[in-house]
Amino acid sequence: IGFSMVVLLSGTLTGIIAICQWLTLDAHIPGMVNMQNAVRPYANFAQPNNMATFLIMSLLGCVYLYEKQKIKTWVLSLCSFILIFAVALSQSRTSWVACLCILVYGAYQQYKGLITLKWYYTLAWLALFIGLIALLPIATQWIGQVTNVDIAQTKTAAERATGDMSRLAIWEQMLHAILDRPWWGYGWNQTSVAYTLVSDHFQG
């Protein structure tokens, strides 16, 4: 319980920082990391995907505390909203996959009667998450026009889902590197060596 409370508190603070970065308030608040030219908020993490993963852990901590009834429901709901909002701001595709896995696992737990969280609450939070992902680009543009503030631009879900496919090419190239030396490899921490050698005969 103590660990869940710490994770929830730090996750909520992380979410608040991410929201401030989205609104470009980070440049005016002492002690907060200035995003500068970064597009996706990352709060006190160096990378948006890392932040999103931690925020999902915080959400799971929130569910645990709800099940144990250690914190009032309205407090947990407020924290959950901040966490979900920040996850949507991160535009992390990793979080989309994680949410899908958690939903499947949660549905199984509900079927077995191991958790008391109602299925319609879960669907409501999922709908909120999807709605935030869909509406954030519109909200970002509107806030920028109304306030004349250059806030961090967010991409649409379609752009995030289909954009930057270069990662797949890199994975394909690394697969060829593994097939070239399946037994002895390239040595500890020698990924760059593998990349250089495979580039001679396979361009990713």
Model-predicted segments: where are they?
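Flexible juxtamembrane loops connecting transmembrane helices in multi-pass membrane enzymes
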Residues: 40-44, 102, 133-173, 196
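TM-adjacent membrane-interface loops and short helices in multi-pass inner/ER membrane proteins
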Residues: 47, 159, 166-204
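Alpha-helical transmembrane segments of multi-pass inner-membrane proteins
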Residues: 1-142, 194
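Surface-exposed loop/turn and secondary-structure junction residues enriched for glycine/proline
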Residues: 32-35, 45-48, 54, 146-154, ...
